[in-house]
Amino acid sequence: MFKLLSTANPKIQKGTDKGYLSFILHLAPADVAGYNTCPKATAGCKAACLNTAGRGGMFKRGETTNVIQKARIRKTKYFFENRSAFLDDLTADIMKAVNFARKRGLKPVFRLNGTSDLAWEKYGIIDQFPTIQFYDYTKILGRKIAHLPNYHLTFSAADGNDADVAEALAQGMNVAVVYDKIPEGVYSADEDDLRFLDPEVGIVGLKAKGKAKKDTSGFVRRTIPILVDKQAA
């Protein structure tokens, strides 16, 4: 139905209980496709990237890729190598998605950086839909989105970007922090993907999932002591 967008994400589907249907664009992260889609990527976030979560991480025996990964690489190359056609297709997808959601009595919302961190405010897409909500996570400070009241950004904490986190908080942004266990009193961002609905609480918590559970880079903030095998040490 859609050339570029999808809704096949369990967490995104939780938003339907609140009357929203999220559509997401998944590109290949970092430099996986030969183009850098995550200019502020860190070693920790690369290792724990949700690019290989769910079906994206299901590989047949002996294989290192699958149809999901191939599709994300193909879309990424399309974006960088035929930008105008890509943006035309994305615009058409958004229009279809708006109609799809509204026919089902839901509000369409869009996250264009499902597994990337591109400055979508530069490409004239969000401007075309001023009454539609867009939202993303980002590690890039200082993005110019004041002219786009329908675009919400949540800053992402990672290994080695504590100074940027402090600046983002000073600018009034919410910051998503991945924990092994979300501390008591920290607002949980795990209930849905609708970050634009979050109260302005500063820190919003996400629980480590998949590969992130084994992170030792500092990407995942530890609230539970790591047990060390003394015999292996």
Segments the model singles out, each with a brief description of its role:
Residues 1-233:
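Class I S-adenosyl-L-methionine
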